[in-house]
């Protein structure tokens, strides 16, 4: 089995060799910029790790893995534009370095580049991998639409929110794992269990992101703390705050959410104080643990030697205890 560090090194090496040589250069500079910002590279890493569980060689999974990473960064580029985010990985976002129109068009070019890379999948697995990716891409768009619609709703349920983050975040992790498994020669049953593992770990991952947006550190998180609060984004914490708040707390939350002009630090502090009063940090951590426990059961169902799953388990354990 390849070490996680070796897999990451291979991914970074392959990304650095990606060439966008078609004119005009200005269309592709933002793509090179966002890919150069780094990141966890967890999606391509999951693809290669899943492949490696079933096959000593990961070569046939390299290009599809790169395609999934390019696609992921495309979603971030458009996400940042829609959220009007200033920072991504502690660097200015694409629409801040260039402009909104450039971010839209370069993002479109990234989506095409992702399809080109995934289209390089070996013929025997091409249809299944491409179908899975296309379904995933459509689901992610649906998740983003739900996310935007939730911003103007005050009655979003926890169940609706979980479905939204399943679509927006978890399905791509699941797709990455299943793609790697299929290319490694896994059975359909094992590929399905790895997909379910990806869903559960993805839900835990996004809930951890919600938590870090409130309780993280800007220096390590790579994004401004409280960004979701400032945008009135319906996160797991806000949805449960609105559900559990007493009359006074509910009025305070709604008052802040209705304000068009406010001091950002004061709004973040006000929300955080109410979250603390309602013990939402613990509630969120309990939910994260539940999805993590479910993901462990998915791995136990795999028809492989337990030692082959050691690296995958270690990486996911690290994700669940991250600060960035």
Task: Enumerate the predicted regions with their spans.
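All-alpha prenyltransferase/terpene-synthase fold signal
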Residues: 1-324
């Amino acid at each position: 089995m390849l070490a996680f560090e070796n897999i990451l090194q291979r991914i970074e090496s392959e990304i650095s060799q990606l060439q966008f040589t078609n004119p005009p250069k200005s269309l592709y500079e933002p793509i090179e910029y966002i890919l150069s910002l780094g990141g966890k590279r967890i999606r391509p890493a999951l693809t290669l790790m899943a492949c490696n569980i079933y096959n000593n060689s990961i070569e046939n999974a390299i290009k599809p893995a790169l395609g999934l990473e390019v696609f992921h960064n495309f979603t971030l580029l458009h996400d940042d534009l829609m959220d009007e985010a200033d920072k991504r990985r502690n660097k200015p976002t694409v629409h801040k370095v260039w402009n909104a129109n450039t971010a839209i068009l370069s993002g479109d070019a990234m989506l095409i580049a992702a399809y080109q890379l995934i289209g390089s999948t070996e013929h025997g697995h091409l249809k299944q991998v491409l179908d899975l990716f296309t379904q995933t891409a459509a689901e992610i768009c649906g998740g983003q639409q739900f996310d935007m619609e939730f911003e103007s709703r005050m009655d979003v349920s926890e169940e609706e929110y979980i479905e939204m983050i399943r679509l927006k975040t978890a399905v791509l992790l699941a797709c990455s794992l299943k793609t790697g498994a299929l290319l490694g020669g896994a059975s359909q049953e094992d590929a399905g269990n790895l997909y379910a593992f990806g869903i559960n770990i993805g839900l835990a991952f996004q809930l951890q992101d919600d938590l870090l947006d409130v309780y993280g550190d800007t220096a390590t998180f790579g994004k401004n703390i409280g960004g979701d609060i400032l945008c009135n984004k319906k996160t797991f914490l806000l949805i449960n705050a609105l559900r559990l708040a007493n009359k006074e707390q509910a009025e305070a939350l709604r008052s802040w959410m209705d304000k068009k002009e406010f001091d950002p630090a004061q709004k973040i502090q006000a929300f955080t104080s109410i979250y603390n009063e309602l013990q939402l940090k613990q509630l969120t951590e309990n939910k994260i643990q539940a999805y993590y426990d479910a993901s462990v059961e998915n791995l136990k169902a795999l028809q492989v030697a337990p030692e082959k799953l050691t690296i995958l388990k270690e990486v996911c354990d690290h994700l669940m205890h991250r600060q960035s």
